[in-house]
């Protein structure tokens, strides 16, 4: 439940200050004399009490208008007000990956000076200066490569990716727990709103690549139970579920989703886990949008119409995502925003992509997914997480309204997340069981080839030597 805090108090004062002089007279001046005037006074006082109670108990219901005393051209003041009353939620940040690779999981190491400052894009001060209200922390593991050829390993070859994914989740949870005054771990959309109301940064987990789940829907379910709430269907490699954009960029065929990928989409819908289409090929995007029973997300992508980067979404996909109720969250990666001249990328390129998506898909379907700490270089003007307010100000300069900014900042992704949860509830109420499909290319080792013991029609095939010596 939302707590009473300065956000709610500020909004209440705004309501009081914005009432007309005549209405204040009714509410604040107890009329004397006739019963009618006394009833009017009581009615006015009761009405104001209801308004104030609703504001203080749920600050998210009171953010539809800016205070009347803010100059519409004072973009900094408008931004501060909006981000104080609506959570700014980034769809993708790789700080846990840096902790794993640079500190070998050791968040208690003295070198991890998160409180006093890091050279990376993210630390305590930068998050607070950037008015961040929620963050999807990425559990990212590289696509497995052959150590000699640097080529993708065969899909049925056992790798370390699932183990490392579990370690990455462990890092994220311990990191969040280490700073309880700053972060609150959440696994549902309601908690994300509660965290913001409590003055904390809601912290959520997304897995950046279904190659990390061991080709197994059973593993998928366990990762959900550990708190992961989205999975990027592919990273920079094909997997058993679908084609990656990187494959098409290298001249490979765009085969879209596999048959097993269709089972994966269905199970993600049943679980209430968001399907992330960043990194996937265009046909994988289209196949998923056709099959999914819930909205989808692009946690960190861009508009293909502005930059011919094959991992960006073309306009037909932007429109289909909107029709499905989903969201496209814009990334800050230079080489994708400006493939012709990455060093020239600036904050204005990001604004261009946001604006294009808003015009094609609508303001209900656009958000931000930076990929901070997952890319070595970011656009000028977006050097770290402290720069989000400036991004919002530039959108306002282009003409974005306060309501549109609130949607972009966090309301859209929270709506999508909530709708994915509701779709899962509906599917489960219908009685759909966990999907037991198994990838056709799975290799069964000898120890997994069970002897015929359970069933009468097969017991005659029992081979005593196979069972081993007593």
Curated annotation (Swiss-Prot):
It is an enzyme of class 3 (hydrolase). The chain crosses the membrane at residues 40-60. Hydrolyzes a wide range of dipeptides. Coiled coil: none annotated. This is Putative dipeptidase TSTA_079200. Glycans are attached at residue 188. CDD domains: rDP_like. Zn(2+) 1 binds at residues 92, 94, 208. Its cofactor is Zn(2+). Its EC number is 3.4.13.19. It comes from the Eukaryota. It is a single-pass membrane protein. It is found in: Membrane. It catalyses: an L-aminoacyl-L-amino acid + H2O = 2 an L-alpha-amino acid. Zn(2+) 2 binds at residues 208, 279, 300. GO terms for cellular component: membrane. Substrate binds at residues 235, 311, 371. Belongs to the metallo-dependent hydrolases superfamily. Peptidase M19 family.
């Amino acid at each position: 439940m939302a707590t009473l805090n300065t956000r709610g108090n500020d909004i209440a004062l705004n309501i009081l200050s914005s009432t007309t002089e005549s209405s204040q007279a009714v509410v604040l001046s107890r009329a004397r004399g006739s019963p009618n005037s006394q009833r009017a006074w009581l009615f006015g006082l009761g009405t104001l009490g209801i308004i104030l109670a609703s504001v203080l108990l749920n600050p998210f219901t009171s953010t539809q208008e800016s205070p009347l005393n803010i100059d519409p051209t004072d973009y900094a003041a408008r931004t501060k007000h909006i981000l104080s009353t609506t959570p700014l939620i980034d769809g993708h940040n790789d700080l846990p990956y840096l902790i794993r690779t640079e500190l070998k999981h050791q968040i208690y190491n003295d070198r991890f000076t998160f409180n006093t400052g890091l050279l990376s894009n993210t630390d305590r001060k930068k998050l607070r200066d950037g008015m961040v209200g929620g963050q999807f922390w990425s559990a990212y593991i590289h696509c497995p490569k052959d150590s000699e050829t640097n080529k993708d390993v065969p899909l049925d070859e056992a790798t370390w990716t699932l183990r490392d994914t579990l370690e990455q989740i462990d890092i994220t949870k311990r990191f969040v727990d280490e700073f309880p005054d700053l972060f609150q771990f959440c696994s549902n959309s309601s908690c994300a709103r509660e965290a913001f109301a409590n003055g904390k940064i809601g912290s959520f987990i997304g897995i950046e690549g279904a190659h990390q789940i061991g080709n197994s829907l059973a593993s998928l379910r366990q990762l959900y139970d550990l708190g992961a709430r989205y999975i990027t269907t592919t990273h920079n490699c094909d997997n058993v579920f679908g084609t990656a954009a990187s494959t098409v960029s290298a001249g490979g065929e765009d085969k879209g989703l596999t048959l097993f990928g269709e089972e994966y989409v269905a199970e993600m819908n049943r679980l209430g886990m968001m399907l992330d289409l960043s990194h996937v090929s265009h046909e994988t995007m289209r196949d998923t949008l056709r099959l999914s029973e819930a909205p989808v997300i692009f946690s960190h992508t861009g508009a293909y119409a502005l930059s011919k980067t094959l991992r960006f979404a073309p306009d037909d996909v932007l429109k289909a995502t909107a029709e499905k109720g989903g969201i496209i969250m814009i990334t800050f990666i230079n080489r994708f925003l400006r493939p012709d001249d990455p060093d020239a990328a600036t904050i204005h390129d990001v604004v261009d992509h946001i604006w294009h998506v808003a015009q094609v898909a609508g303001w209900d379907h656009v958000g931000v997914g930076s990929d901070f700490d997952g890319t070595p270089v970011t656009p000028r003007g977006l050097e770290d997480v402290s720069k989000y307010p400036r991004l919002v100000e530039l959108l306002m300069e282009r003409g974005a309204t306060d309501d549109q900014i609130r949607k972009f900042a966090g309301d859209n992704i929270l709506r999508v997340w909530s709708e994915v949860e509701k779709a899962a509830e509906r599917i489960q109420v219908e009685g759909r069981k966990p999907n037991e499909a198994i990838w056709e290319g799975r290799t069964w080792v000898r120890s997994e080839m069970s002897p015929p013991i359970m069933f009468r029609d097969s017991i005659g095939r029992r081979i005593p030597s196979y069972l081993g010596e007593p």
